[in-house]
Amino acid sequence: MPWIQLRIDTDGPHADAISDQLMEEGSLSITFEDGKDSPIYEPTLGETPLWNHTVIIALFEANFDLSPVVERLKQLPCLGENFSYKIEQVEDKDWEREWMDNFHPIKFGDRLWICPSWREIPDPTAVNVILDPGLAFGTGTHPTTALCLEWLDGLDYSNKDVIDFGCGSGILAVAALKLGAERVTGIDIDYQAIEASKANAERNGVQDKLELYLPEDQPADLLADILVANILAGPLRELAPLIAEKVKPGGLLALSGLLQEQAEEVSAFYSQWFDMDEPAHKDDWSRLTGVRK
């Protein structure tokens, strides 16, 4: 069946109050969108911030009369008589199919492909990782994941052990194993991420070479020839001594999840343990690499 949606322009501080009003008016669902392409990075613990310019999208049944709803919304002090809104008809679609159509095989470097399970593999002779969007972050579409995958594609894995620090979906761990790593250890604070990594390793037939741990369960003497950490700038700074002690002398490091303006500071911080390279950039994001002293 078709639907009707009401789009309202507002700001972050008032979005929740307007959302509550719309639910009372009979909205079937509420969605918040960024109105001006201003993403939010590293919210504090327990915080769910919204954008300064937030678009609220309220969905109603097609025969719903929105005129009285709009009139009542005008009485809200945070909106007023001349608030900006738009009413649109929304056609009924196979939303699951439309969502799936947005994901395609992606190539990273010279030999690595990340392929959704419902797509045909473009190059059966390449290194192919089968991975679907799911519970944990990391499908290759984000610039930080792409930067890490491109770096992993260019490495020699002969007799090498790898640590994926903050493994999320397991995409980097599985890619390293498919590229030839001897063994990979994945560490994450989220049990759901551990389960997602395990499932993706099994799907790609590399589960026997992947060990997964919550931080409190990891071996005390864990060391690697290669460590990749795609998290955020704050945790990268806080965990730097712990990360450094897990890399063997002469071992390789890659850090991502940080913005370009954060790269210089984080690189300087890690330089006490590593000989750091020049950053690599993609869109607004950066990757740092280095060699353990």
UniProtKB/Swiss-Prot annotation:
Recorded hits in Pfam families, A to Z, give: PrmA
Q: What does the entry list under GO cellular component?
A: cytosol
Any one GO MF term held by the record is: protein-lysine N-methyltransferase activity
Q: Which UniProt keywords apply?
A: Cytoplasm, Methyltransferase, S-adenosyl-L-methionine, Transferase
Q: Name one GO biological process term.
A: methylation
Major subcellular site = cytoplasm
Q: Which residues bind S-adenosyl-L-methionine?
A: T145, G166, D188, N230
User: Might you give the EC number(s) for this enzyme?
Assistant: 2.1.1.-
Show the coiled coil region(s). Answer: none
Q: Which reaction does it catalyse?
A: L-lysyl-[protein] + 3 S-adenosyl-L-methionine = N(6),N(6),N(6)-trimethyl-L-lysyl-[protein] + 3 S-adenosyl-L-homocysteine + 3 H(+)
Q: What class of enzyme is it?
A: transferase
Task: From the Swiss-Prot or TrEMBL record, state where the protein is found.
Answer: Cytoplasm
Which family does the entry's similarity section mention?
Answer: Belongs to the methyltransferase superfamily. PrmA family.
Which NCBIfam families does this chain map to?
prmA
Function (record text): Methylates ribosomal protein L11.
Cross-referenced HAMAP family: Methyltr_PrmA
Descriptive protein name: Ribosomal protein L11 methyltransferase
